[in-house]
């Protein structure tokens, strides 16, 4: 079974080519970009299941800060799309920062093809599990509100939450 669409963002054309070959048997569609600044527009036009994001784009800079900035941007704009970070300049602190900023996982270059594919599949599967839990919660909340004949205060009381979080959950 092939997964949907992956967006790979890396400034190195050779890396993009290698990843297209490596991931061709796993994904239906592989979109590539040499820079992350065009990704927000692309993400509005193309449905994407996962993003593989390099962490460094400026010549001579290998701190990973650019990747962290774009990771936070993608998480803010498209929280449902998992982002896996990839870099040749990895250290434990950078990986921790990436995970704390919302990355689904972290891969180092050079990568092992099987490990990369497994990591991407796992990230997609985990993101779909979260959506399922949210849909279960939403269904339950709507049933309680219906049972309370639309009385939000009573529904919040039965759910053990205050009205404000209940309103937020109903908006989703």
Predicted features and spans:
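Two-component/phosphorelay signaling modules centered on CheY-like receiver
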Residues: 13-32
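Short hydrophobic/Thr-rich beta-strand motif most characteristic of the beta2 strand and flanking loop
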Residues: 27-36, 42, 62-63
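Active-site beta3 strand of CheY-like receiver
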Residues: 46-57
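Short amphipathic alpha-helix used as the core "switch/output" element in two-component signaling
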Residues: 62-79
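C-terminal output helix
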Residues: 110-120
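Bacterial C-terminal helix-turn-helix
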Residues: 134-172
